[in-house]
Amino acid sequence: MSSNATDLTTGFIASIVAIVLFGSNFVPLKKYETGDGMFLQWVLCAAIWLVALVVNLILHCPKFWPFAMVGGCIWATGNIAVVPIIKTIGLGLGILIWGSFNALTGWASSRFGWFGMDAEEVAKPVLNYIGAGLSVVSAFIFLFIKSEIPNNTYSVDTTPLISEHVINKTQDPDPDCSWVDKLSTAQSHLVGCSLAVISGILYGSTFVPIIYIKDHSKRNDSIYAGASQNDLDYIFAHFSGIFLTSTVYFLAYCVAMKNNPKLHPEAVLPGFLSGVLWAIATCCWFIANRSLSAVVSFPIITAGPGFIATMWGVFMFKEIQGRKNYLLMMLAFCIILTGALCTAFSKI
C-alpha cells in the first residue's frame, strides 16, 4: 500500500472515531445536575490535560511551543458556554449550531489561508466546496426533528438528550438554580443560539496556532523554523492552554461568587469521563488533520457528531419517535454521507 493510501486510510479511520466520540462525550452527563457549568468545565479540562500528559510521555516529550497554547485558550473560552447552551436549546441543537460554524470557520481559514496560514489546495476544489456546503445543510435538517418526551416528565432518567428547553412557569424558584434557569423561553432560545454561534467560531479557530506553526516551520527566517509537522507533537501545549484557561475562568468565577461557587460533586466522575472522551476524539482529529489536511477533515468531523447525538436519542433514550422524525434523520444522514464523500474525493 502506498504512503498516500495509508495516510488516507489512517485519516478516515481517525475521523470516524472522532465523530463517534464527539457525538457521545456529553452522554455520561445526561443524568446529572451540572449547575451553571463552571465547575464542570474545569473538571472536564483537568481530564483533558491528563490525557495530554499521557500522550506527551508516549511521544517522548516533543518540543513545547507556547504559541500552540493559544489554540487551547480559544477552545476553553468557547467551552465555558457549553452547559448554558445545552440548558437553553438542548444538546442536539447546540451541537448542530456550533458544529456548523465550527465547520465553516475551520474549513474557510484553512482553504483560504486566513490568520497568516498557508492556503490549502485540494485536487478537486469544486467537490470540496460541495462537501463543505452539504455538511452545513445537513445540520439544519436536524432542527425539524422533535423529541417525543412528555413535558411533564421530570425524572432525570428521561430528560431528553436532544430537546427544546421548556420552562415550568408554575414551579417554585430554586435558590440553587443558575442564571440560565431564570431565562424566559424566548430569552433562552436567543441566548442559547447566540452562545452556540460564538462557541462554534471559537472552536473553528482552535487549530489556527498549530497550523500556523507548521506552515512557518518551512521558512528559514521564521522563529518556528524546523518545528514538527506531526500535529500530535502539539497536543500537550494545546491541552495545557485549555487547562490553564479553564482554571483562570474557574478562579474568576469563584471570586465573582464570593468564594461560594456552585459545585456538583455527583458530576465529577461523569465530567471526567466526558473530558477523556473529548481528549481522545481531539487526538484523532489531530491525526486526521495530519493525514487528510484540515480543509478535508473539518467538514467531515464537524458534520457527524450531531447525527451520533441523534442516534443516542433514538436507540438509548427512546426520545425520538414517529415516521416523520425517522425520515428526516435518514435524509440528514444521506446528506452527511454525500458531503463526507465529496470532501473525501476532493483530496484524491
Curated annotation (Swiss-Prot):
The keyword Chloroplast does not apply. Pfam families: TMEM144 (PF07857). GO terms for cellular component: membrane. Keywords: Membrane, Transmembrane, Transmembrane helix. It is found in: Membrane. The chain crosses the membrane at residues 8-28, 39-59, 64-86, 93-115, 125-145, 193-213, 235-255, 267-287, 295-315, 326-346. GO terms for molecular function: carbohydrate transmembrane transporter activity. It is a multi-pass membrane protein. It comes from the Eukaryota. The keyword Acyltransferase does not apply. Belongs to the TMEM144 family. This is Transmembrane protein 144. It comes from Bos taurus (Bovine).
